[in-house]
């Protein structure tokens, strides 16, 4: 599995942390110790890693925090602190405080990548490497490394699935995440580009509205769309947790047999729905394990180490995790990857 492989790559460390004042004997001993650490995953220099995330107010973000904490706890040489922000302004203030505390690295899943770019750049300028998760900063200078899912490809794969199911004819609704962030824009653009390529004008996009990744907002938005449209063939949603509200609206209206729905994220609730068959036809894995991988990357960078499976001595600047489509055909096989 590509997602598991990406996560596995960042778990083990390799490096050569020699001191220029060491004697030749000491240098040889250091090199031998480094080689042993490469093979066994032994601890290195103790580092302090801070993580800043948005409110963990739905399942995926809750798992982001949990996976980051789990990864940090695997290492005896990591001191870890996670802070949650109420909004983008609060997060910027929190990161400024973290900069003043001088951790060895900061992991950031920004509330809004563009708005948080200046403070991330400040951290980098202060010599604190930043690992960017999920929502991109506005400039590459704001992070030493970035790990994210391929949001554009989620849109592409959803378009391919819906185009096939509808035979490129029908009415589609798109329920987006948070307006203006890179995740939403990429998922929307990937879908738009692919559906146009495959179907031309055969698919009519009836509505396209954000619901902020929240189930309650999904319910409200979908209720209004259902009232305004008598014939809907498919719903492309950006998030499985948000889709719980969307599904509730459709079922409350008694219209679940009229349409199909695709999600994104890989929640266990979505897996259950897909296994049952009917309305919820597919989702796309966008695993919160990337937060754990981000902590592992931050550890390697802070310790000046690289990744054992790569020839290059430094951690790559970008890791993109491809989405995996989940349907009735493979839901049982992929169930270990879902999140509660």
Segments and roles (model prediction):
Residues 14-27, 31:
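Bacterial lipoprotein signal-peptidase II cleavage site
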Residues 39, 45-46, 179-183, 194-198, ...:
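Hinge/cleft segment of the Venus flytrap/periplasmic-binding protein
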Residues 41-42, 47-75, 80-93, 97, ...:
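Extracytoplasmic "Venus flytrap"
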Residues 59-74, 154-158, 182-202, 217, ...:
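Short, solvent-exposed amphipathic alpha-helices that sit
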Residues 72-84, 172-174, 197-213:
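Short beta-strand elements in bilobed, periplasmic/extracellular small-molecule ligand-binding domains
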Residues 91, 147-172, 217-219, 266-271, ...:
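Hydrophobic alpha-helical segments within soluble ligand-binding/sensing domains
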Residues 108-125, 191, 207, 211-272:
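Hydrophobic alpha-helical
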Residues 114-153, 164, 171, 267-275, ...:
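Flexible loop/hinge segments that line or gate small-molecule binding clefts
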């Amino acid at each position: 599995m590509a997602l598991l492989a990406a996560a596995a790559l960042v778990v083990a460390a390799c490096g050569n942390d020699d001191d220029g004042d060491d004697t030749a004997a000491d240098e040889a001993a250091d090199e031998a110790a480094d080689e042993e650490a490469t093979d066994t995953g032994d601890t290195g220099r103790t580092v302090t890693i801070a993580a800043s995330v948005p409110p963990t107010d739905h399942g995926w973000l809750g798992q982001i925090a949990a996976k980051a904490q789990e990864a940090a706890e695997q290492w005896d040489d990591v001191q870890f602190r996670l802070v949650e922000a109420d909004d983008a302004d609060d997060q910027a203030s929190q990161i400024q405080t973290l900069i003043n505390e001088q951790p060895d690295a900061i992991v950031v899943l920004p509330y809004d990548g563009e708005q948080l770019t200046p403070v991330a750049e400040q951290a980098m300028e202060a010599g604190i490497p930043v690992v960017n998760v999920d929502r991109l900063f506005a400039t590459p200078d704001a992070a030493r490394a970035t790990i994210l899912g391929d949001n554009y490809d989620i849109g592409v794969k959803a378009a391919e699935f819906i185009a096939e199911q509808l035979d490129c004819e029908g009415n589609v609704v798109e329920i987006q995440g948070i307006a203006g962030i890179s995740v939403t824009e990429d998922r929307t653009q990937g879908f738009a580009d692919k559906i146009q390529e495959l179907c031309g004008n055969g698919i009519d996009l009836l509505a396209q509205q954000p619901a902020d990744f929240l189930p309650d907002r999904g319910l409200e938005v979908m209720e209004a769309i259902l009232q305004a449209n008598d014939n809907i063939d498919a719903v492309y949603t950006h998030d499985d947790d948000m889709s719980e509200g969307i599904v509730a609206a459709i079922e409350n209206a008694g219209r679940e047999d009229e349409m199909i729905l695709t999600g994104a994220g890989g929640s266990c609730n979505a897996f259950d729905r897909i296994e049952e068959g009917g309305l919820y036809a597919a989702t796309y894995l966008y695993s919160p394990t990337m937060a754990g991988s981000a902590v592992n990357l931050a550890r390697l960078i802070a310790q000046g180490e690289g990744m054992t499976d790569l020839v290059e001595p430094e951690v790559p600047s970008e890791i993109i995790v491809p989405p995996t489509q989940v349907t009735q055909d493979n839901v049982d096989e992929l169930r270990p990857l879902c999140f509660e």
